[in-house]
Amino acid sequence: MSDKTVKSTNLMAFIATKMLERQEDLDTCTEMQVEKMKTSTKARLRTESSFAPRTWEDAIKDGELLFNGTILQAESPTMTPASVEMKGKKLPIDFAPSNIAPIGQNPIYLSPCIPNFDGNVWEATMYHHRGATLTKTMNCNCFQRTIWCHPNPSRMRLSYAFVLYCRNTKKICGYLIARQVAGIETGIRKCFRCIKSGFVMATDEISLTILQSIKSGAQLDPYWGNETPDIDKTEAYMLSLREAGP
């Protein structure tokens, strides 16, 4: 097994432990799912003992380092509290320490960061494209990423948010909220896969299946074939998305 497998086990150990510390916030169904995740993670830990011996406590400690990004040698600007509107209600977002993550070679990342249409505010703007509600600002190859993971108090189900911001401006420029799922362990694994994919486009309650289809479309779109940023084309493209509407 690979080092990635060990890290994944450590992350799951940390998440399961932290969630069970908040049992009073969980309904019976969610608590049972987290207990099941903890049991399966302990089984994985025993399986890995032949090549990566460690205690449960060691796994939790390493998982916390991975989750919080403290193992990364990087300074992260402080994220300020914000809220996301979902179904007419504003839900708070609490930001964990940010991780610097490699962007990869997906052509969608080759466009520069641009200000919002008022020319001053660097904020995410909602667009409707290919059946998905998405938030996107252009990238100048400087994104950092934060993952926030906690039981949603309103639904007692796990929800995820990926928060993106530009190091040049130290302003939030996008976020992703993945749809709540009944299977917590499955949902967390999807969450990790989304991070590893290097694909960042924010959606509002859109399944990861649709997210992947948007990714495929973006890779095939000749517009994103530009190897150098073109601010005029970028602004025109963003404006066309806004005018297209839902």
Swiss-Prot record:
InterPro entries: Flu_C_NS1 (IPR005187), Flu_C_NS2 (IPR005188), NS1 (IPR004208). It is found in: Host cytoplasm; Host nucleus. GO terms for biological process: symbiont-mediated suppression of host cytoplasmic pattern recognition receptor signaling pathway via inhibition of RIG-I activity; symbiont-mediated suppression of host type I interferon-mediated signaling pathway. It comes from the Viruses. The gene is NS. GO terms for molecular function: RNA binding. This is Non-structural protein 1. GO terms for cellular component: host cell cytoplasm; host cell nucleus. Prevents the establishment of the cellular antiviral state initiated by host RIGI, which normally triggers the antiviral transduction signal that leads to the activation of type I IFN genes by transcription factors IRF3 and IRF7. Also participates in the up-regulation of the splicing of viral mRNAs. The keyword RNA-binding applies. Belongs to the influenza C viruses NS1 family. Its main location: host cell. Keywords: Host cytoplasm, Host nucleus, Host-virus interaction, Inhibition of host innate immune response by virus, Inhibition of host interferon signaling pathway by virus, Inhibition of host RIG-I by virus, Inhibition of host RLR pathway by virus, Interferon antiviral system evasion, RNA-binding, Viral immunoevasion.
